[in-house]
Every structure is written in structure tokens, then in C-alpha cells.
């Protein structure tokens, strides 16, 4: 478990009050997922040993896909990886354009010391490692040509690490960032770091200093990602883990965008093995993986990652990792862990009022309120539970055993659908023509 600070604890409870998955500290109440977490640790070990790989997290609404993806990234950072968490959106992220995907990956790039927008820090660490290596080999860091030797090593190392596949503009920008920082021109160096991260709003004057025009294109972005990956490792990190959350959003896109997005996932899966030290995690619903509107409609991808299950048994090691819904024992365990973590003014009152009998009653009422299937709405349970912790903490005479009665809050369409048991698969999905197999980057 990572070291918990008071700031982390406050972040956890503020997020849960709003129905959100916390971005850190979640390993403190990760209960009942040891086997799935162990498989993701195995994937991290593969990446650390130099493998490139991709894993799909499969689960219905409320199964904890986002939680598991964020937990995997937290574990990855604790093991020395850089990470990035990207949410698929039909408004903000056009998944069929890899320059969009690359830009979001770079914006969300983080490490244990720099949680977001970490490319500048990673570059500094890599350049520092090069300077230290040159000094260790006998070079004089005060010599007039020392910076030129660093610049040449940047070029040589990028060519060696990427097998010559890093675009020349990528190399020139990295070298120019180094030059500008040595000159004290932090503003233009920062602008070029933004360009390297996929920004399309960098001034022409800054780009001119690196001898580049235009922006990173969709067809170039995969090669840029290869360069970034190698710099991440050269900076001392074990590798890079990228989580793509809510891939089922692709199902709501226009047909042409949906087809291109599915082919984009296929291209990522096809290329994954050649990106040594990179682990992709992609979350999605069974509908996304199993219908002809989704992965099942694109035969080359479906054949590679099709979910295999015999009765109630499924291997954790196959391409799709199945996440199971919450059950009553798991809810009780999570509630007890949250009670332990809660930053109460009077911990004894919390333990006395939010008792084991009250937790058991709340779990039972929630389960009954949702037709015996609490697994579809853990968000509601956790919000209700944290609210009871707050009520006891704030009001000395409040007793939840006598004052509180569970009433389901307004449900989202996804929750209504999950509880009703209605199939999400539409006639259109069943009649969907096969997705054309094409390279779109």
C-alpha cells in the first residue's frame, strides 16, 4: 500500500462524496480484487522486463473498471513507471485520430513526483543522466564544447533507442529544448515542450527556432510516442502504462468515426509488442466487446482478443480481464476500510455509531432496494455511506440506526438499465455490417 497522507485521505472522501473514483490513495480500500490486481501486476512485470503488451478490462456498469484502471496506474507508479489516464470522449477526444490520443496521453503523463504534465521533468531527468554519464566517462562539464557533446548524445541515444524511427522533427525539438534551457530561454523551451506534447497552439516563432513547421499529425503520432517511451525509460523509469477508459463511448459515435476508432484500437494492439516497456490498458463493457457495433464487428481484432469462458470459469491471463460486480461481503469490507480511514474529529463516536450492525443493515437495505443486485450501483452505496460518516462526525446526537433509512437516489440511465435487466444490445447492433479492416493512422 502506498503511504497515505492527510491530503490523500481528504481527496478520497471528497471524491466519493461526488460519486467519483479518487485519483490516488485508492489502494487503501481496494477489497476483494486481489486476483485481478495480481494479473495486472504480472502485466507490469512483463513491461518492466522489456515486453510491450496490451490488456483489456471487461465489466458491466458498476464493476469498477475505472477504479481498477486507476489502481493499476497507482501500482505502476509505485513500481517506478510513468503513467497516463485517458478517457474516451466523443467531444474532447476523437479516438480515430491518434494525434488526439497522443495529445491527451501527453497532457495526462505523470510520475510519482509529477502527477500531470510530466514531460518537461522527464526530459530534464534524461538530460541530467546524459550529463552525468559524460562526466563519469571523463568529460569536463565546464569545457566550452560540453553542451555540444550533450546535444550529440541526445541525437545518438534517440537514434539508438528508437532504432532510427524517431521523426527528425522530434529529435530537433528535443535538441532545441536543451539549447534554449542552456541559454536561459525557459519560455520558448516550454513552448516547444508543449508542441512535443501535441499542442496545436504553439507560436510560429518558437517552432522556427527548432526548424519545424506545422503540428504533429495523426500518422506521425505513433512514432512520436515511441520516442517519448524511450525517453521515459532513459530518464530512469521502468516503462510507461497508458489507460484508455470508457472505450464503450465509441459505440455512440457516428458509424464512420466508430469504424475508424475500432481500427485504431486494432492498430494499437498490432503495434503493442514493438513498444518495449509500454503497457496499454483499455476498459470497456461487454456490449463494446461482444456486439457487431463494437469489437465483434471487426474480425481481425475480435479474433485476437475474444473473451473465452467455460461455465463460470475464465482465465485471468487472456486478453480480456473480467471484472466482477460488487457483492455483499465486498461492500462490507470496503465500508469497514473507509470507516478506519475517515478523518473524524471523534473517532470513538464514528466507531460506535457506524457500527458493524449498521453497516450490515445498510448493505442489506441497499441490496433490497436494488432488487438484490447491489453490484450495479456501488457509487450510490459509497455516497450514502460517506454521508452517514459525515453526519455522525458533524452532529453529536445523530444516530444512523434510528434516524437513517435508505432510499435510492435518482438513477442514471445506465443504472436504470442495469437494474431493469434490459438488454443494451439493439437490433441495429445485431444487424450491423462488419467493420472494414483499414489502417487509419
What spans do the regions from the language model cover?
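Helical mechanochemical/support elements of P-loop NTPase systems and associated helical scaffolds
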Residues: 8, 32, 36, 53, ...
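P-loop NTPase nucleotide-binding core
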Residues: 54-59, 63, 67-235, 393-397, ...
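The catalytic "switch" region of P-loop NTPases
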Residues: 5-8, 189-354
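C-terminal alpha-helical "lid" subdomain
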Residues: 176-194, 311-314, 324-441
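Alpha-helical scaffold elements adjacent to nucleotide-binding pockets in ATP/GTP-utilizing enzyme cores
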Residues: 39, 71-75, 97-108, 260-264, ...
Amino acid at each position: 500500500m502506498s503511504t497515505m497522507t492527510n491530503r490523500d485521505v481528504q481527496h478520497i472522501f471528497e471524491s466519493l462524496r461526488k460519486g467519483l473514483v479518487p485519483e490516488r490513495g485508492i489502494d487503501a480500500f481496494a477489497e476483494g480484487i486481489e486476483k485481478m490486481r495480481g494479473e495486472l501486476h504480472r502485466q507490469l512485470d512483463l513491461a518492466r522486463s522489456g515486453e510491450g503488451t496490451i490488456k483489456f478490462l471487461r465489466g458491466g456498469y458498476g464493476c469498477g473498471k475505472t477504479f481498477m484502471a486507476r489502481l493499476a496506474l497507482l501500482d505502476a507508479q509505485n513500481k517506478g513507471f510513468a503513467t497516463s489516464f485517458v478517457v474516451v470522449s466523443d467531444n474532447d477526444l476523437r479516438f480515430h485520430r491518434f494525434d488526439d490520443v497522443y495529445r491527451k496521453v501527453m497532457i495526462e503523463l505523470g510520475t510519482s513526483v509529477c502527477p500531470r504534465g510530466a514531460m518537461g521533468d522527464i526530459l530534464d531527468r534524461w538530460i541530467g543522466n546524459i550529463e552525468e554519464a559524460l562526466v563519469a566517462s571523463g568529460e569536463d562539464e565546464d569545457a566550452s564544447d560540453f553542451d555540444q557533446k550533450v546535444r550529440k548524445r541526445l541525437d545518438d541515444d534517440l537514434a539508438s533507442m528508437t532504432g532510427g524511427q524517431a521523426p527528425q522533427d522530434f529529435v530537433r525539438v528535443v535538441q532545441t529544448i536543451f539549447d534554449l534551457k542552456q541559454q536561459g530561454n525557459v519560455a520558448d523551451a516550454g513552448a516547444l515542450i508543449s508542441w512535443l506534447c501535441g499542442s496545436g497552439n504553439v507560436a510560429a516563432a518558437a517552432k522556427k527556432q527548432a526548424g519545424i513547421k506545422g503540428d504533429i499529425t495523426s500518422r506521425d503520432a505513433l512514432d512520436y510516442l515511441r520516442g517519448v517511451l524511450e525517453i521515459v525509460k532513459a530518464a530512469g523509469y521502468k516503462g510507461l502504462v497508458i489507460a484508455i477508459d470508457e472505450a464503450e463511448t465509441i459505440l455512440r459515435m457516428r458509424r464512420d468515426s466508430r469504424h475508424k476508432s475500432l481500427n485504431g484500437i486494432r492498430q494499437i494492439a498490432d503495434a503493442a509488442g514493438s513498444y518495449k516497456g509500454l503497457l496499454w490498458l483499455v476498459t470497456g463493457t461487454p456490449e463494446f466487446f461482444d456486439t457487431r457495433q463494437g469489437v465483434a464487428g471487426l474480425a481481425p481484432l475480435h479474433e485476437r482478443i475474444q473473451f473465452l469462458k467455460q461455465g463460470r470459469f475464465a482465465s485471468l491471463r487472456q486478453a480480456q480481464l473480467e471484472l466482477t460486480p460488487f457483492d455483499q461481503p465486498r461492500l462490507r469490507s470496503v465500508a469497514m476500510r473507509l470507516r478506519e480511514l475517515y478523518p473524524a474529529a471523534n473517532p470513538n463516536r464514528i466507531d460506535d455509531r457506524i457500527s458493524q450492525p449498521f453497516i450490515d443493515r445498510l448493505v442489506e437495505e441497499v441490496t433490497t432496494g436494488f432488487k438484490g443486485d447491489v453490484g450495479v450501483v456501488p457509487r450510490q452505496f459509497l455516497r450514502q455511506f460517506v454521508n452517514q460518516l459525515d453526519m455522525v462526525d458533524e452532529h453529536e446526537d445523530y444516530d444512523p440506526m434510528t434516524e437513517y433509512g435508505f432510499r435510492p437516489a435518482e438513477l442514471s440511465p445506465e443504472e436504470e438499465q442495469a437494474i431493469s435487466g434490459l438488454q443494451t444490445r439493439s437490433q441495429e447492433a445485431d444487424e450491423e455490417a462488419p467493420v472494414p479492416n483499414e489502417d487509419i493512422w
